[in-house]
Amino acid sequence: MYKIVRSVLFLFPAEWVHYFSMNVLRILCSLDFIRKFIASGFSPRSDSEFGIWRLELTNRIGLGAGFDKNAKYLRELEALGFGFVEIGTVTPLPQAGNDKPRLFRLPKDKALINRMGFNNDGVKIIAERLRQWAMGNGQYPTSNSPVTIHHSRLIIGGNIGKNKVTPNEDAWKDYEICFKELHHYVDYFVVNVSSPNTPGLRELQEKESLRKIVRHLQMINNGKAVAKPILLKIAPDLTKEQLDDVIDLAMEIKLDGLVATNTTIDRDGLNHDFKIGTRETGGLSGKPLQKRSTEIVKYIFEKTKGEIPIIASGGIFTGADAKEKFDAGASLVQVWTGFIYEGPAIVKKICKNLK
């Protein structure tokens, strides 16, 4: 059924379809009986639960950052069965992102190219939206995990970045602003220094730049009544030496986890849509990233001896794909491009196939 729907949706621009589909789902889920019907059809079985960072997840399948940038569709995504959703990337100030078109499908390769450019409503508006979500879903400020009390059990991650106009030497200030504003409303943080769509951002993956940003956030975190896990999202295009530097730093400062990986600027994995892939700049995601992502997950796990939890992201479409990541050492997995190609039942199908 979804293949038929997808063939129609793919006739229209990718970004337009994204918002159209989610807004239709939001309208449907505004009716409680329809939301419950959707949840009963798409949520995986209760025996998929998993605990990590003192958080209890309904399952190990999450939605990666960039899908719900502005925390507008949390109820709808929970109804589709996601165990956790990573909002953002959130920046201190609102920004429009790069010029459209900026999202491209490569259907023969089951891939996407995006050069969105951290388009988001800004941290103030998003924090207020999360506050309203918390109030409406029975979450309380004294909770260790404010998003898992009473009505909702959805775990929310906050993916944070810097504004395009902020020079790299001041980037730590942008991460601090976002961290403080969102701290009360998210369950964990992901520091994003690996997007290829903000000029110069990946330079912040260098060891000393990273140390400055993350250690500063850890100091703020330690002063809070309840500390939140801080993770780092890394690029798949790092050299072995760069990756070793990141891992060594993560071990040294006791980072709570790594997200492996972001999108790639490499186009070698394309087999069919090479013309589109080379014409359009931006980050490539989906099946072409699958092998490299798994290699990095395995390398991190072996080098850290499993001491640092890993969220795997890249080319996950099926239960077999997820199992490959778990076997490589991942604790959790995130889908994004797979969600577009496989449809709303992806979480339930993956969880079922993992049994």
Q: Language-model features: where?
A:
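Short beta-strand/loop segments at the ligand-binding rim of alpha/beta enzyme cores
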Residues: 54-63, 153-158, 223-238, 300-312
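Active-site glycine- and acidic-residue-rich loops that bind
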Residues: 163-175, 202-203, 209, 231-252
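C-terminal helical cap(s) of enzyme catalytic domains, especially alpha/beta-barrels
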Residues: 94-110, 268-282, 337-355
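A gly/proline- and charged-residue-enriched helix-loop-helix capping module
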Residues: 88-134
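Arg/Gly-rich low-complexity intrinsically disordered repeat tracts
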Residues: 132-152
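Glycine/Thr-rich beta-alpha phosphate-binding loop at enzyme active sites
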Residues: 26-29, 33-43, 195-206, 249-306, ...
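Glycine-rich phosphate-binding active-site loops on the catalytic face of alpha/beta enzymes
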Residues: 83-95, 193-195, 257-265, 315-316, ...
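Catalytic cores of alpha/beta
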Residues: 70-79, 238-252, 302, 306, ...
